[in-house]
């Protein structure tokens, strides 16, 4: 694209100012100077980093906070030593912003998080018949191509609501010693949901 990192960051900040302005914030000389009714120039984001930044999203939050400060917005990071404080705040609907990691089941069912009657509905407060229908269509059909298309539509729906920003996807790694294990006996195509433990009875030692 021909842009340096500094140019990319500058363009991102300009875009951020545009989004803030579209949301009703007052922008003067490249700085946020006033917030619209119901909004603020400062927000707290909770993250369970053990009080020492031990979380995959902590670095991104820190960089975002530093960048936003240059345009007049204060993103305060509350790195919690006790993660239950954040979940209590979520359940009482007092958390302004927060970082967490969702774990999916073996079957990538979106019901547990995104359906209005799912266990985490109160975290996002999305009560949409359209989204509920997409989630139910996906979880009640065994055709993988169909499910993929339906879930993509549902995820696009969620992105449009802007209730979450996907940051990373965790991957697992399994390490075996070729001196101790017959690698030909290790299951092939291991995934997060299908590990060597699923066929551990077939693994042979050298």
PLM regions and their residue ranges:
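Sec-exported extracytoplasmic/periplasmic mature domains
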Residues: 17-26, 66-73, 91-95, 100-103, ...
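Bilobed periplasmic-binding protein-like "clamshell/Venus-flytrap" ligand-binding domains
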Residues: 23-50, 101, 142-178
């Amino acid at each position: 694209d021909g842009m340096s990192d500094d140019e990319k960051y500058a363009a991102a900040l300009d875009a951020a100012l545009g989004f803030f302005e579209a949301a009703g914030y007052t922008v003067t000389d490249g700085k946020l100077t006033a917030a619209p009714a119901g909004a603020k120039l400062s927000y707290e984001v909770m993250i369970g980093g053990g009080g020492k930044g031990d979380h995959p999203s902590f670095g991104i939050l820190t960089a975002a906070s530093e960048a936003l400060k240059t345009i007049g917005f204060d993103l305060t990071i509350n790195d919690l030593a006790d993660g239950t404080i954040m979940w209590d705040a979520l359940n009482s609907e007092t958390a302004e912003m927060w970082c967490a990691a969702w774990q999916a089941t073996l079957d990538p069912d979106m019901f547990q998080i995104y359906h209005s009657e799912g266990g985490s509905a109160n975290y996002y407060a999305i009560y949409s018949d359209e989204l509920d229908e997409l989630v139910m269509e996906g979880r009640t059909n065994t055709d993988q191509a169909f499910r993929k298309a339906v879930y993509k539509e549902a995820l696009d729906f969620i992105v449009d609501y802007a209730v979450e920003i996907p940051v990373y996807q965790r991957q697992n790694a399994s390490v075996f010693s070729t001196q101790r294990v017959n690698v030909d006996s290790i299951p092939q195509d291991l995934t997060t949901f299908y590990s060597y433990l699923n066929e551990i009875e077939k693994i042979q030692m050298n």
